[in-house]
Amino acid sequence: MTISDHPETEPKWWKEATIYQIYPASFKDSNNDGWGDLKGITSKLQYIKDLGVDAIWVCPFYDSPQQDMGYDISNYEKVWPTYGTNEDCFELIDKTHKLGMKFITDLVINHCSTEHEWFKESRSSKTNPKRDWFFWRPPKGYDAEGKPIPPNNWKSFFGGSAWTFDETTNEFYLRLFASRQVDLNWENEDCRRAIFESAVGFWLDHGVDGFRIDTAGLYSKRPGLPDSPIFDKTSKLQHPNWGSHNGPRIHEYHQELHRFMKNRVKDGREIMRVGEVAHGSDNALYTSAARYEVSEVFSFTHVEVGTSPFFRYNIVPFTLKQWKEAIASNFLFINGTDSWATTYIENHDQARSITRFADDSPKYRKISGKLLTLLECSLTGTLYVYQGQEIGQINFKEWPIEKYEDVDVKNNYEIIKKSFGKNSKEMKDFFKGIALLSRDHSRTPMPWTKDKPNAGFTGPDVKPWFFLNESFEQGINVEQESRDDDSVLNFWKRALQARKKYKELMIYGYDFQFIDLDSDQIFSFTKEYEDKTLFAALNFSGEEIEFSLPREGASLSFILGNYDDTDVSSRVLKPWEGRIYLVK
């Protein structure tokens, strides 16, 4: 039912779905080569279904040289052989559907690999028909040593210049990410058509139900690619967002992409589109149903709290109030509109949420993991769960730089070493930053059992592609948690059941109001749906604390909490305790 004053409550499958994100390299290895693969995912579909989720989102499985773990695609229509075959993928889609779940794939179309045939043609000569499918520019000049100077001062998201010099034609190509991850030029209509046909149409024809659209705000660059104003006075290179994010034609491009999808699908299924927009104030424009762009967006505000806007590994202090406001910004904009929101706190680009936002000590890891589950399940929007989050995975501890795999970490390590030295203060700060914030924390292989050395991810005599987080030896694994009724895993199952039972309030709830916003310990709020009110009281501290009622004399009916032995009529919360109530 749609509430007339709240068009956002119009029911849709993709609004009510809980979506489980899979990082294929690290999920499950079926053939003992050390890499996760598509057959491995297929073998665990029942586990995912039993968790209580409704759809899976699989990160890139396409052919790729793997400079950035598959986000550098060399062929959109072929599975990377290490992950399997196209037939393996078609089987995975089919079996996902047979279990009553939807299949969502990653759509990486801001850039492709330099190994893609399109780029090979483009780089071959300045007169090639595909030359304008990418951003080619001559050097701005040459330095005293005769080295070419990049066309502008944009910094790569992964550090260093956003330009790479190519000696084939003595020009630079733009690549906002890794050196061989070259940006596609959406201004070129032939390029757009080819992207739509190869990356989108091919997979729609094979039954996918939706796309997670990678870097969805970057397709329209600032005309002329001018130098960025100086925002970071400590650096000659400037963050590329000013010149590349939410550009003048971005909404036009998403409307065109949506039209292509709608026209391609002939069986009536509704394709969901979640755009990774990251920053900016355009979320309501992107997601308005009347504008036909994307279904919902991922914003980064709440997961970037506590990090520097200039360098993601610089840790800065933050308050609970700041985090609360950042989380709420993900969904407040949809209130009373035809837009929609997402709720997530983990993905393949973020460290583990218990370490980041709760307490990963042995004493409180489990209870604070359940607290984050309560928070996420009580927020309005489409819910996303990232592999390992459901078992309360935490960051790995005290790994040397040699154990890290992420190209972003490796690039910045080399830049800092060259600029400041191996034993500098800057390097020590960098090590603190990656210990808390590195993407690698989310990319360690999934621990299925307690068995050494590989926790059931791959065979015992196989060297996995990436080191396992040693936490599987302390009980953070699927096997042990499945048998433990008090585990984070089984709490997730109960929480997802509650979210479905109370979906009007938990999924579609509107008129969100903070209670005790200024508190640095309590995260509490109310939401409405018709004449019903949900109240959440969550203690984000290691101390007992009393919470305020949503209104004087309110009568509370308990729904769910993360402590079994608690007096739900008491207004005192134990350390890291959370409760969800109906207000009578």
Curated annotation (Swiss-Prot):
Family assignment? Belongs to the glycosyl hydrolase 13 family.
What protein name applies here? Alpha-glucosidase MAL62
Q: Which organism is it from?
A: Saccharomyces cerevisiae
According to the entry, what is the taxonomic lineage of the organism? Eukaryota, Fungi, Dikarya, Ascomycota, Saccharomycotina
Reactions performed catalytically? Hydrolysis of terminal, non-reducing (1->4)-linked alpha-D-glucose residues with release of alpha-D-glucose
Site (Transition state stabilizer) residue list = 349
Q: Which CDD domains match?
A: AmyAc_SI_OligoGlu_DGase (cd11333)
Q: Which UniProt keywords apply?
A: Glycosidase, Hydrolase, Maltose metabolism
Q: Name one GO biological process term.
A: maltose catabolic process
Q: Name one Pfam family in it.
A: Alpha-amylase
Top-level taxonomic group: Eukaryota
Q: Where is the active site?
A: 214, 276
Q: What is its EC number?
A: 3.2.1.20
Q: Which InterPro entries match?
A: Glyco_hydro_13_cat_dom, Glyco_hydro_b, Glycoside_hydrolase_SF, O16G_dom_2
- GO MF annotations for this entry? alpha-1,4-glucosidase activity; alpha-amylase activity; glucan 1,4-alpha-maltotriohydrolase activity; oligo-1,6-glucosidase activity; sucrose alpha-glucosidase activity
Q: Which PANTHER family does the protein's record reference? A: ALPHA-AMYLASE FAMILY MEMBER, NEUTRAL AND BASIC AMINO ACID TRANSPORT PROTEIN RBAT
Gene3D superfamilies xrefs: Glycosidases, Golgi alpha-mannosidase II, Oligo-1,6-glucosidase, Domain 2
Class of the enzyme per the UniProt entry, highest EC level: hydrolase
